[in-house]
């Protein structure tokens, strides 16, 4: 298994699909990375030599991925909560943030039903 951006990327998959194992890299961004490093998308990672894997590492390093991206997202949510804006309040109360109805749905966000005490 090749190690890119601190993640063991599966080497039995095609390069485009294998790069999506890294948090912050989807299919489109992995296609951009493969094109910039001169690697065919259909090539499997186990068939690449060390210089090509190093080229992938340098291309991935230009993006914000994994721990840095997770930290950035959580800091953005924390900032909204500290501001006290509507979105921050919805995050704080564990309710849907983007305008979905919450009277009957939103069970995933709200968690399991709480029993009503009589």
From Swiss-Prot:
GO molecular function: rRNA binding; structural constituent of ribosome; tRNA binding
GO cellular component: cytosol; small ribosomal subunit
Record-linked Pfam families: Ribosomal_S13
Keywords: Ribonucleoprotein, Ribosomal protein, RNA-binding, rRNA-binding, tRNA-binding
InterPro entries to which the protein is assigned, alphabetical: Rbsml_uS13_C, Ribosomal_uS13, Ribosomal_uS13-like_H2TH, Ribosomal_uS13_bac-type, Ribosomal_uS13_CS
UniProt region (Disordered), positions on chain: 94-118
GO annotation (BP), single: translation
Family to which this protein belongs: Belongs to the universal ribosomal protein uS13 family.
NCBIfam families: uS13_bact (TIGR03631)
Known role: Located at the top of the head of the 30S subunit, it contacts several helices of the 16S rRNA. In the 70S ribosome it contacts the 23S rRNA (bridge B1a) and protein L5 of the 50S subunit (bridge B1b), connecting the 2 subunits; these bridges are implicated in subunit movement. Contacts the tRNAs in the A and P-sites.
PANTHER family in the record: 30S RIBOSOMAL PROTEIN S13/40S RIBOSOMAL PROTEIN S18 (PTHR10871), SMALL RIBOSOMAL SUBUNIT PROTEIN US13M (PTHR10871:SF1)
Subunit structure comment from the entry: Part of the 30S ribosomal subunit. Forms a loose heterodimer with protein S19. Forms two bridges to the 50S subunit in the 70S ribosome.
Protein's name according to its UniProt entry: Small ribosomal subunit protein uS13
Organism, scientific name: Psychromonas ingrahamii (strain DSM 17664 / CCUG 51855 / 37)
Gene expressing this chain: rpsM1
